[in-house]
Amino acid sequence: MAARGSCVSRQRQVLFLFLLGGLCLAGSELGRYSVTEETERGSFVANLAKDLGLGVEALAAKRTRVVCDDNKQHLFLDSHTGDLLTNEKLDREKLCGPTEPCMLYFQILMDNPFQIYRAELRILDINDHSPIFQDKKMILKILENTAVGTTFRLERAQDSDGGRNGIQNYTISPNTFFHITVHNSDEGMIYPELVLDKALDWEGQPEFSLTLTALDGGSPPRSGTATIHILVLDINDNAPQFPQELYEIQAPENSPIGLVVIKVTGEDVDSGVNAEISYSFFDASEDIRATFQINPFSGEITLKALLDYEFIKSYKLNVQAVDGGGLSARCTVLVRVLDVNDNAPELIMSSLVNEVVENSPETVLAVFRINDRDSGENGKMVCHIQENLPFLLKPSVDNFYILMTEGALDRESRAEYNITITVSDLGTPRLTTQHTIRVQVSDINDNAPAFNQTSYTLFVRENNSPAMHIGTISATDSDAGSNAHITYSLLPTQDLQMTLTSLVSINADNGQLFAIKALDYEALQAFEFHVGATDRGSPELSSQALVRVVVLDDNDNAPFVLYPMQNASAPYTELLPRTAEPGYLVTKVVAVDRDSGQNAWLSFQLLKATEPGLFSVWAHNGEVRTTRLLSERDVPKHRLLLLVKDNGDPPRSASVTLQVLLVDGFSQPYLPLPEVAHNPTQGEEDVLTLYLVIALASVSSLFLLSVLLFVGVRLCRRARAASLGGCSVPEGHFPGHLVDVSGTGTLSQNYQYEVCLMGGSSGTSDFKFLKSIYPEVHAYSSQDNSDGNPTF
């Protein structure tokens, strides 16, 4: 399965190589530069603008950048001058160790088109380290019969500097028995040997203490010292012997700590103390001493630290065996570290763009390099991204890859992508590294605002408070940022008679509509206009929606009584014959209401009456009718207070006062006349006075002449009416005719009378009806239609 995945990935890489024909992926050598170590940050290395043959502006336009192989920012490019400068103090010993020359490899990356230039920077050494001996005190045991000219190899000193600044010579403190010679090792390093110049005598001088000095070649030179303690021993005939001078072994780099790598064994044919052998490392570096340890009694060499093939591939161990008499032998153990697939691939990002414009195809998002510190198959890698993404991964030179868009993106469909770059090696087992890049798709103004509805209907009740919120018009824009910031406005209306700005206003930010002033349903029931929504993109895009405002009726108008008409001087008067049957139509109250709906549904009610049980009002049509037969006891004048009420919430009402005069047939000569210009209080007092007079007269004559007086009064009234001629009528309004506005008639017939007004000293006035003129003749033929609705 892994092999199949590798095959597919390789096929994709081959495809990518064909796709790279449109890009300039140069891998040219730029040059070699040098800089001295430990120089301050910002030290000049080279002028890349000059070396590349480009101007400073061109370098900036191409987004030129510097990438080092170890993924550390040792260098940086000054965009203003085109100079390549150091980004930190460079320590040659830290970067390269003892290796000489010390080279730092880096690349120059440029876009538009994409190019790579390889370059090298040599770190020049300065003498900033002194030689150091790992063992500050060395002990040598030399037999007293050792021949003159015998050499003894000493441990060399360590110097982190290289070249001429490394160790160049060794010296020893002045003496007559020894001198120092210098020899070159196979690794190209020098080591000291102690040479015996004069025969030793244990009895004469059993020990020596000498100072060994290591000198480097710097200017001025640096030095390091160690003490050599020489013990002169009595004669030991045989030195230890190793079976072989060179041991070669292999150790996997994942070997555990404490593993016995090898056991070396020396032999000594002597006996006793002279045959007792101790083992130790000789002339071992700091890395060897930190990684291995040797058992001084058994010769077992064990791991002290983990091996790392990528750091050190082999170790050369010099093992020394010393017997009890001071004689020694040496052998070499060569430990070769075997590589295992213990390093996952590395992904080193050189440049990264986390945002891309949605309509920009083939935009470079990232440039990165992959690396695996393992070797062989363990170091071979394949790289790929997820399927079904609108992105391409194109390989370049030196394990560089380019991540770019495959085509134009659509932010409204998907505004963010998480691209996972997977790098796998071909080792066993396979190791994988993943790096996720989060890419934001930036917006362009390619979508106009869209209203939630094509049309809106808003309802507002009349008599609203000015600046009242009546509704919200909402639009959305699938773009982002300023491209989605919507501004609302009222569009000009085509109705020239309507000034829209005097009726409504709109909040430009949130689309809230407000009524400028109080609306009047009776003046304006509904109106329409368009609202525009415009974004702030470039160019601006807009859309519009229709808004219809419907004004709801409020019960703000009280009923208006058309009939009977009211005035400030006196209530309207109707005549009622005493012979009227129950249900007789006295009059009909006609009223209208400017409101609509249930606010204009009117009902009628009798609030007050002189005789409450005599009259009734039909609630739905306003007809005032009698409820019973009239009697002689009923007073001749009745005042009715009628209420006209609508069905609003709360209801409104109007009242009308109606005065009804009772007549004994329409030929009766005398009837009381309603007061003219009297206030209601005075009228009630007059009625009370009349009642008192009648009551007093009745009590006085109750026992004697009650029946005769009653008959006489009636005969007297009839005789007086027959003998009475014409009389003058005082000025003042009095209806000469009665008109039923509704067409049904307030009385069963229409009459016209000649009347005269007679004044009295009591302050009251009476009508005298003389005779009927034009009986049964209608006064207004135009109003003779029955059951017709009035027109106003």
From Swiss-Prot:
Pfam families: Cadherin, Cadherin_2, Cadherin_C_2
Transmembrane segments: 693-713
Main location: membrane
Gene label: Pcdhb18
Membrane topology: Single-pass membrane protein
Gene Ontology CC terms: plasma membrane
PROSITE patterns tied to this protein: CADHERIN_1, CADHERIN_2
Matching SMART domains: CA
Keywords annotated in UniProt: Calcium, Cell adhesion, Cell membrane, Glycoprotein, Membrane, Repeat, Signal, Transmembrane, Transmembrane helix
Localization annotation: Cell membrane
One MF term in the entry's GO annotations: calcium ion binding
Extent of the signal sequence: 1-26
Protein name: Protocadherin beta-18
Superkingdom of this protein's organism: Eukaryota
Domain Cadherin: 27-133, 134-242, 243-347, 348-451, 452-561, 568-676
Record: glycosylation sites: 169, 418, 452
Role of this protein: Potential calcium-dependent cell-adhesion protein.
GO biological process, one term: homophilic cell adhesion via plasma membrane adhesion molecules
Disulphide connectivity of cysteines: none
